[in-house]
UniProtKB/Swiss-Prot annotation:
Swiss-Prot/TrEMBL induction comment: Expression is either up-regulated or down-regulated upon activation of the lymphoid tissues and this regulation may depend on the presence of IL10/interleukin-10 or IL13/interleukin-13.
Organism: Homo sapiens
Membrane topology: Multi-pass membrane protein
Annotated keywords: Cell membrane, Disulfide bond, G-protein coupled receptor, Glycoprotein, Membrane, Receptor, Transducer, Transmembrane, Transmembrane helix
Cellular compartments annotated: Cell membrane
Keyword Membrane: yes
Gene3D superfamilies xref list: Rhodopsin 7-helix transmembrane proteins
Name of the coding gene: HRH4
Designated name of the protein: Histamine H4 receptor
GO molecular function terms listed in the Swiss-Prot or TrEMBL record: histamine receptor activity; neurotransmitter receptor activity
């Protein structure tokens, strides 16, 4: 945790000002994530696989604003001594919430990767509520196992009167392992899922361009095939009529009848081909438009995930690097500068940004928010109503 001794030299007015702005951040985190949770409760249309993971993320970020920051303000700015029990509770809860937030981001990225790379299998095999709840619980269990046991065990390593920070802060290798589990692996996984999403989109876009006019090709091939069959049948009828010995009159009648039959056959085949071609062309155009809409939706999704990855890296990389560097110093001489405190706060700032990056960019959540605030889109007046009013 940040060095409380560095706040002793601050004036009371400065501390009150800082406490006010920190409280605003905590309130903004609670408000933004509470809206996401409320939207999930109010709107039943949100209760599908991806929205459950958004809910899990919002819960972890919400309690960052409820527990982590409110306990941090009096301890750091006003030198409130927690005591051992409250200190252990705060550390365990704070690390649990922040790590769960990170792992929920990984889970959401993985879910989006499955929906883009294999949409059919995603829709048919991943709809069970039990599987979704199992994944949500697994996030919290893994998040606790990363830091929780070490915080409890290393509490006996600390000296009396030391700061409220984990006892393993003086062991660089433990910090390296926890940073690897909290930051490095999640960043690699989220980057991997995003790259695969972009690769799948590129392949789909390339395939869509190559098959931009599949209906025209099918029509031309059908028409050519039926025309060829019509000509072939006419030739066969003509050759058959010349080979049969008969009188000149009967032969001429036979030729006329064969020509009329071949022309009718050709006209019927062309008519059938044109009808089949029109059906195949309309079906292919509709299919192409549907694929184009899905491709645009997937592109927007990929862009939002790319922004998420960048924000996540910016919010977590500085603190992970600082903790490893500070582990080489003793707790008394560690240079915990203002940059360390900024890096520390960036983790909590990520909990404020998450509801803006995820649900607020999701159309279903936007509709749910409009429902919460009782905002309805006003329909445009029709021409009939305008004429009546005039």
């Amino acid at each position: 945790m940040p060095d409380t001794n560095s706040t002793i030299n601050l004036s009371l007015s400065t501390r009150v000002t800082l406490a006010f702005f920190m409280s605003l951040v905590a309130f903004a985190i609670m408000l933004g994530n509470a809206l996401v949770i409320l939207a999930f409760v109010v709107d039943k249309n949100l209760r599908h696989r991806s929205s459950y993971f958004f809910l899990n993320l919002a819960i972890s970020d919400f309690f960052v604003g409820v527990i982590s920051i409110p306990l941090y303000i009096p301890h750091t700015l006003f030198e409130w001594d927690f005591g051992k029990e409250i200190c252990v509770f705060w550390l365990t809860t704070d690390y649990l919430l922040c790590t769960a937030s990170v792992y929920n981001i990984v889970l959401i990225s993985y879910d989006r990767y499955l929906s883009v790379s294999n949409a059919v299998s995603y829709r048919t095999q991943h709809t069970g509520v039990l599987k979704i709840v199992t994944l949500m619980v697994a996030v919290w269990v893994l998040a606790f196992l990363v830091n929780g046991p070490m915080i409890l065990v290393s509490e006996s390593w600390k000296d009396e009167g030391s700061e409220c920070e984990p006892g393993f802060f003086s062991e660089w290798y433990i910090l390296a392992i926890t940073s690897f589990l909290e930051f490095v692996i999640p960043v690699i996984l989220v980057a991997y899922f995003n790259m695969n999403i972009y690769w799948s989109l590129w392949k789909r876009d390339h395939l869509s361009r190559c098959q931009s006019h599949p209906g025209l090709t099918a029509v031309s091939s059908n028409i050519c095939g039926h025309s060829f069959r019509g000509r072939l049948s006419s030739r066969r009828s003509l050759s058959a009529s010349t080979e049969v010995p008969a009188s000149f009159h009967s032969e001429r009648q036979r030729r006329k009848s064969s020509l009329m039959f071949s022309s009718r056959t050709k006209m019927n085949s062309n008519t059938i081909a044109s009808k089949m071609g029109s059906f195949s062309q309309s079906d292919s155009v509709a299919l192409h438009q549907r694929e184009h809409v899905e491709l645009l939706r997937a592109r927007r999704l990929a862009k939002s995930l790319a922004i998420l990855l960048g924000v996540f890296a910016v919010c977590w990389a500085p603190y992970s690097l600082f903790t490893i560097v500070l582990s080489f110093y003793s707790s008394a001489t560690g240079p915990k500068s203002v940059w360390y405190r900024i890096a520390f706060w960036l983790q909590w700032f990520n909990s404020f940004v998450n509801p803006l990056l995820y649900p607020l960019c999701h159309k279903r959540f936007q509709k749910a928010f409009l429902k919460i605030f009782c905002i309805k889109k006003q329909p445009l007046p029709s021409q009939h109503s305008r004429s009546v009013s005039s």
